[in-house]
Design a protein with these regions (language model features):
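Alpha-helix boundary/N-cap detector
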Residues: 1-8, 68, 72, 102-113, ...
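N-terminal "first-domain core" detector
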Residues: 1-43
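Short secondary-structure junctions and interdomain/linker hinges
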Residues: 17-24, 84, 125, 129
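Extended hydrophobic/Leu-rich segments
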Residues: 28-32, 47, 53, 103, ...
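Short aromatic-glycine-(Arg/Gly/Cys) micro-motifs in beta-strand/loop hairpins
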Residues: 33-61
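Short Cys/His-based metal-binding microdomains
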Residues: 59-64, 71
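Ampiphathic alpha-helical segments that act as solvent-exposed interaction surfaces
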Residues: 68-88
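Intrinsically disordered, low-complexity, charge-dense segments enriched in Lys/Arg
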Residues: 86-152
Length: 152
């Protein structure tokens, strides 16, 4: 497994979705090249035989998951990008007159509908994992193994 392989495969899968853009492709590169240092943003370091999926808060790693499975790495990135794109749609259509977003059941359902539509185009195993509601925070429970998540 290498970072370039993961980026190319993720990009190919996302190109199946009409909402994907060149800006999102740049974000994939940031996830893998270590320049994505904002709070609560996904980062991936691909080493020789495994990848480290992690999230930072104020420069400190607050969550880390290690895996040897390329499809888990790709799923983490797909989930992150699809979430960002769906948030854009939500902000464009579900804010009040003052510009505030209120997370109501309608907003949550709309976000889920967008994600479900996108993952249905990505195929398996990604679509199934999305149907199961697996997020990066659930990787240890869902994918098990000796790859323990770390919370700081």
């Amino acid at each position: 497994m290498n970072a370039k392989e993961c980026m190319i495969e993720t990009d190919k899968l996302l190109q199946k979705w009409s909402c994907y853009s060149i800006e999102n492709r740049r974000y994939i590169e940031k996830i893998f090249n270590g320049s994505n240092r904002y709070d609560m943003m996904l980062n991936v370091d691909v080493m020789q035989k495994q990848a480290k999926i992690y999230v930072l808060e104020r420069g400190v790693t607050i969550y880390e998951y290690r895996t040897e499975r390329k499809e888990i790495v790709i799923y983490a990135v797909l989930r992150d990008i699809i979430g960002i794109i769906s948030d854009t749609f939500i902000c464009d259509s579900h804010v009040d007159e003052k510009g505030y977003l209120h997370f109501t059941e309608n907003v949550s359902n709309y976000r889920k509908k967008i994600a479900d539509e996108a993952f249905s185009l990505m195929g398996e195993p990604y679509n199934e994992w999305n149907r199961q509601g697996i997020s990066i925070w659930d990787f240890n429970r869902s994918f098990g193994g000796n790859k323990r998540p770390t919370f700081s």
